[in-house]
Design a protein with these regions (language model features):
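Conserved short beta-strand edge segments in small beta-sheet-based binding/regulatory domains
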Residues: 36, 76-90
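Short S/T/G/P-rich N-terminal loop/turn motif that feeds into the first structured element of a domain
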Residues: 1-68, 89-106
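A common structural junction motif
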Residues: 24-29, 73-82
Length: 106
């Protein structure tokens, strides 16, 4: 099933999330690591500051495993909406936004 996901980034864990997305930690997670990485690469930051992306998931509870292992640690106010497939979202690329946050903290 495909979902549109909206959430607020937890700024205090942004650097950790970026590191795990780029060093293979999340990618190696089974069964959904690659989909999480791909989803974060599709994600955007909307004008309101919300992070928005689309993702495929086959858990009984939408994004159940993804939330337990990654998302609930790094995002708050996460909501899902069933959609027909991957969606295009308007906004700034999320990964570039993470890079900016990390650069400001160095």
């Amino acid at each position: 099933m495909f979902y549109r996901v909206r959430a607020q980034l937890r700024q205090d864990t942004a650097a950790e999330l970026r590191r795990k997305l780029t060093d293979g930690t999340i990618q190696s997670q089974k069964p959904d690591g690659q989909e999480i990485v791909d989803s974060m690469n599709r994600a955007v930051v909307t004008k309101s500051g919300e992070i928005e992306w689309s993702e495929v998931c086959y858990c009984d509870t939408p994004l159940g495993h993804e939330r337990a292992t990654v998302y609930d640690h790094h995002f708050g106010a996460l909501t899902t909406q069933l959609v027909d497939g991957y969606q295009e979202h308007q906004g700034r690329p999320f990964m570039a936004y993470l890079d900016e946050i990390c650069a400001r903290r160095q």
